From Swiss-Prot:
Its EC number is 2.4.2.17. Pathway: Amino-acid biosynthesis; L-histidine biosynthesis; L-histidine from 5-phospho-alpha-D-ribose 1-diphosphate: step 1/9. Feedback inhibited by histidine. Its cofactor is Mg(2+). It is found in: Cytoplasm. It catalyses: 1-(5-phospho-beta-D-ribosyl)-ATP + diphosphate = 5-phospho-alpha-D-ribose 1-diphosphate + ATP. Its main location: cytoplasm. Keywords: Amino-acid biosynthesis, ATP-binding, Cytoplasm, Glycosyltransferase, Histidine biosynthesis, Magnesium, Metal-binding, Nucleotide-binding, Transferase. CDD domains: PBP2_HisGL3 (cd13593). Catalyzes the condensation of ATP and 5-phosphoribose 1-diphosphate to form N'-(5'-phosphoribosyl)-ATP (PR-ATP). Has a crucial role in the pathway because the rate of histidine biosynthesis seems to be controlled primarily by regulation of HisG enzymatic activity. This is ATP phosphoribosyltransferase. HAMAP family: HisG_Long.
Length: 292
C-alpha cells in the first residue's frame, strides 16, 4: 500500500488559493487547516504537503516529494534537474505568464541592462539574476531581498529584479522597467525515480490531464440553442467550436438543437449575430473541464 501513495507538494502563499481552486475544478477537494501544512485530499492515493513554491523544486529533485507544483522561475533559480509533467498556465491573478523584470526609479539615469555595471541590485531571484547578468558580461552586486523589494531603490539598491503580473505595484512605487529577464508559468514537476515508477507516472499523468482540462475550461463555456432548418447553415457558419458543433434534430423536424463549446469572451458578440441568423432558446453554462 505504501507504494500506492503519491507525495505531492502544493505551493503555499500567493499561488495557494488559485491552486486549490484549480484542483477542486479538476475534481479534487482539498481541505487545509490553518494549523497544519498537511492538507486533507479526498483521494487516499495522494498525500499532500504545503510548502513555499521556492522549496518545492529542491524537495522534488531529492525525492522527498514525488511531485509538486511550482513556478518555472523557481526551477531555474534552484538550478535543479527535474522532469516537467505539465505546464499549467496560471498565476495568482490570472491565466497568463508572470514576468521577472529589472526595474529602476523613474528618474534613474539607468536606461539599459548595460548601465547596471557595478550597480547594486536587490531581488529574491539571486541565482538566476547573477547568471543572466554574467551572460551579458555585466558585473554587479546582487543581493537577496527578504520582501518589499519595490521600496529598496534608490537608497538601498540602484535597481531591482522583481516579479510582476500586472505592473501596478511597480508603477505605484514609481519604478520603470528596463528589461524583462524571464517569463514564468506554473509547472507540475517530478523526479527521475518517481517517473520510473509506472503507477506513479500514470497517476501524475492523470492528475495533469485533469488540471489542464480544468484550466482550459476557465476560458470556455457551453452554449445550446434551437435553430430552424432553413437557418442552420447560416448559424453554423458563425460558430467556432472546439470541434464540430453537436447537432440533433428535434421532435419538430423543422428544428435542430445545436450545442458548442466556445471561448467565453466571444459570447457577448456572438449571441446577437446568432439570434439575427435565426437561432433562439439560448442556454449558456459553465464548464469544469475541457479535455480535447
Amino acid at each position: 500500500m505504501k507504494d500506492k501513495v503519491l507525495k505531492l507538494g502544493l505551493p503555499k502563499g500567493s499561488l495557494q488559493e488559485t491552486t486549490l481552486k484549480l484542483f477542486k475544478k479538476a475534481g479534487y477537494n482539498i481541505h487545509v487547516s490553518h494549523r497544519s501544512y498537511y492538507p486533507v485530499i479526498d483521494d487516499e492515493e495522494i498525500s499532500g504537503m504545503l510548502l513555499r513554491a521556492q522549496e518545492v523544486p529542491v524537495y522534488v529533485e531529492k525525492g522527498y516529494l514525488d511531485c509538486g507544483l511550482t513556478g518555472y522561475d523557481w526551477i531555474l533559480e534552484q538550478n535543479v534537474d527535474v522532469i516537467e509533467v505539465a505546464e499549467l498556465r496560471y498565476a495568482k491573478e490570472g491565466f497568463r505568464p508572470v514576468k521577472w523584470v529589472i526595474a529602476v526609479p523613474e528618474d534613474s539615469p539607468i536606461k539599459t541592462v548595460e548601465d547596471l555595471q557595478g550597480k547594486r541590485i536587490a531581488t529574491e531571484l539571486v541565482g538566476y539574476t547573477k547568471r543572466y547578468l554574467k551572460s551579458k558580461g555585466i558585473k554587479a552586486e546582487v543581493y537577496f531581498s527578504w520582501g518589499a523589494t519595490e521600496v529598496k531603490p534608490p537608497y538601498l539598491a540602484d535597481a531591482i529584479v522583481d516579479l510582476t503580473e500586472t505592473g501596478t505595484s511597480l508603477k505605484a512605487n514609481k519604478l520603470r522597467v528596463i528589461e524583462t529577464i524571464l517569463e514564468s508559468t506554473t509547472r507540475f514537476i517530478t523526479n527521475k525515480n518517481a517517473w520510473k515508477n509506472s503507477w506513479k507516472k500514470k497517476k501524475m499523468q492523470d492528475i495533469a490531464m485533469l488540471l489542464q482540462g480544468a484550466l482550459l475550461a476557465e476560458e470556455k463555456v457551453g452554449l445550446k440553442m434551437n435553430v430552424p432548418k432553413d437557418s442552420l447553415k447560416k448559424v453554423l457558419c458563425l460558430l467556432n467550436s472546439l470541434h464540430s458543433p453537436t447537432i440533433s434534430q428535434l421532435y419538430d423536424e423543422e428544428w435542430y438543437a445545436v450545442e458548442v463549446i466556445i471561448n467565453e469572451k466571444k459570447v457577448r458578440e456572438l449571441l446577437p449575430k446568432l439570434k439575427d441568423a435565426g437561432a433562439s432558446g439560448f442556454v449558456e453554462y459553465p464548464l469544469n473541464k475541457v479535455i480535447p
